[in-house]
A protein has these predicted regions:
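Hydrophobic alpha-helical transmembrane segments and their immediately adjacent juxtamembrane loops
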Residues: 240-335
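Peripheral, non-transmembrane regulatory/ligand-interaction domains of membrane transport proteins
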Residues: 2-221, 225-228, 234-237, 241-244, ...
Length: 335
């Protein structure tokens, strides 16, 4: 299983497609190659950025046409769900990014029959990898419907873990920002970037959960007759989990907005402090510059030139002209 995951990551990094076939009759999934044999009685066909040949082979195993990427990306509700001739088609337009948290969002499509599930995706997914690892274990899933429900539960569980992790990171960031220290002020720019990255991840999770929620709602209301009615309880449980995650997402969004406002406020205060210092310096240095300019004139009628202590008097006046504004600023508590 570990070697299969390495092959999957390598193929994805090179932009190659992959077709993995899971069956109850084999201890590990098969990575299909053109011209190769296919394991019997497949339960789950997982396509990752598939080529035309992989699509054609998977469609032959499934006995139904697979959705194109444009079809899975459609945002119209009428294009997301359809059921005909014991073939159920479900699409999630925005599911996972191609490069962790940086790439564009990619869609996810399902084609479900009474005995088999086909999934079409265009990026790696933790929930899919986790389910693939237990497909051949003691609790092996017996039908495509079982695999589909387990995938939905796994997607929600992974989303919950990611939201919890983001919440912990935000708490740590809050402790760093709201600390009266020089280090806290120096990391404000980095904190601003971290808040933006967290907001991006929360938005991604929200988009994925919205797609999953609509799939589950559709199944609760319009599931075909060949889906066991006893499974509706699991559908409702998934929907309940998604509702709880939505509340947590909203709370996390509020905290992120507060953190963003706080960081921008600290940055604004630091800029104001700099402007205040520059203003004080400019005001304090104006009087001595005026005095020095007057006594630096080359007129013969300047009386201070003939004073015995004129130089000391001039220096004293320059220093005094600087001290008076400073004392006044101090009395106003501006310093």
């Amino acid at each position: 299983m570990q070697s299969l995951r390495v092959v999957s990551l390598l193929a994805h990094s090179q932009g190659l497609g992959m077709l993995k076939i899971y069956s109850l009759n084999t201890p590990s999934p098969q990575v299909w190659q053109p011209g190769g044999e296919t394991i019997s009685n497949p339960t789950w066909i997982d396509l990752i950025n598939p080529s035309d040949a992989e699509r054609e082979h998977a469609a032959g195993l499934l006995g139904a046409k697979l959705p194109a990427r444009d079809e899975t990306s459609a945002i119209e509700l009428s294009s997301r769900f359809s059921s005909a001739n014991s073939v159920l088609r479900l699409n999630i337009p925005l599911f996972v990014r191609t490069d962790g948290t940086k790439g564009p969002m990619t869609p996810l499509g399902f084609v479900l029959t009474p005995s088999m599930l086909a999934s079409v995706r265009y990026a790696e997914s933790i929930s899919f990898n986790q389910l693939g690892a237990v497909m051949s274990g003691a609790d092996a899933l017996r039908s495509g419907t079982d695999v589909f429900i387990a995938l939905m539960e796994g997607i929600v569980d992974v989303a919950a873990d990611r939201l919890e992790d983001l919440g912990n990171k935000l708490s740590n960031l809050s402790e760093q920002v709201f600390t009266d220290s020089r280090e806290a002020r120096s990391m404000l720019r980095r904190a601003l970037l971290q808040v933006g990255l967290m907001q991006r991840q929360v938005t991604q999770i929200r988009s994925a959960m919205l797609g999953v929620s609509r799939v589950i709602i559709y199944l609760c209301d319009s599931a075909p007759a060949w889906i066991d009615s006893q499974l509706h309880g699991r559908f409702r449980a998934i929907q309940g989990d998604i509702s709880s995650l939505s509340e947590f997402q909203q709370q996390l969004n509020d905290r992120l907005q507060f953190m963003l406002d706080a960081v921008l406020g600290f940055i604004n205060n630091d800029q104001n402090d700099i402007i205040k210092v520059l203003t004080i310096v400019s005001v304090v240095t104006v009087p001595p510059m005026i005095l020095a300019g007057i006594w630096g004139m080359n007129f013969k009628s300047i009386p201070e030139y003939d004073w015995p202590h004129g130089y000391a008097f001039g220096l004293s006046m320059i220093v005094l002209s600087m001290l008076i504004p400073l004392i006044w600023f101090k009395s106003k508590k501006w310093l």
